[in-house]
Amino acid sequence: MNFIRKKTVLLLTLGALALQASAQPGGRFVQVKSPVVNTDNTVTFNYQNDKAKEVLVDVQFAGRKAMTKGEHGVWTVTLGPAAPDMYPYCFIVDGTTIMDPQNPDWFPNEGFKNSIVDIRGDKELIHAVKNVPHGSVDYLTYYSKTFGLYGNVIVYTPPFYDQNPEKKYPVFYLISGTTDTEEVYFKVGRANFILDNLIAEGAAKEMIIVMPYGNPAKYFPAGTNVWEKGDIFSKDFINDLMPFVESNYRTINDRDHRAIGGFSRGGNQGLALGLTNLDKFSYLCSYSSFTSMELPGVYDNVDSLNNQIHLFWLGVGTDDFLYGNAKDYMDFLDKKGIKNVKEFTNDKFGHTWMNAKYFLDKSARLLFNE
């Protein structure tokens, strides 16, 4: 097993201290810090480039705004105030999109590489780093016979996992969305801190969280027709990923101690895998997901489903572009008589990681309580 173990409190602390000195003509150095979260929850963005003709910032809470060039070629703008949370943003420099070079906190994604600003406010958020025991996060590589290649996965172990070598734990397989990498539920969704806080409060069971990459096509060389290989994500998940996790971590290997779910595409993947493998999973979670009613034979025996599924949890925001599909799926389950738990949010951000974090916090409290 190859892994890099990260102590997440140190990781976040180092990110908050980022500061860079930039050289100027004549040997002068100017310290530029960005972003700066002000006491009124406004945010000042700074970017140094004396040669740029136009610089914009594009941030989730304010949209795209022009920045003003000041002394020493530092472009700046102050936006907000914004509600406390984590927001992705980027700079657009003469038409080219870049991350903030002063900020080490970034959003891992196939299609874009945004930076992240964390507005904390007076009240601690569900993902806040609190003075509680913290778990560990492992970056791992495993060999997939299905792919004929190596895959990536991130694993969270709860506080005191290493200090209790005889103790075994339930497992929650948590899948990120379309274009997201395996890192997103750690770096943006802050699954580790959410679970640390819930466990410390006694609001959730101790559990291992496994965060795989949901898009196996990215493992293959360009031009490979991955789709002709069939549903290789599910095949790898069942035949390669799960055995790897269970041989390297102290997991309780039965359906009553396995949960599966995810955000967006990951929620649909999780439901499809869970519903077609109820011999392996009994807790199912879908966060802001496109959900399918086209699973042959799955929904036919309602009594069997209700007896086998300990928790069928569905969450979506009313402003999410997938709200219509998610609501139709909920109505479909209700008409069938399939028991489920629903959670709705009312917000202006729609299909975002604000909701993904909130849904994880709500559903994790209900896992492994049977």
Model-assigned labels for residue ranges:
Residues 1-27:
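Bacterial Sec-dependent N-terminal signal peptides
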Residues 24-26, 31, 37-64, 69-370:
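Non-catalytic cap/lid and distal C-terminal segments of serine-dependent acyl enzymes
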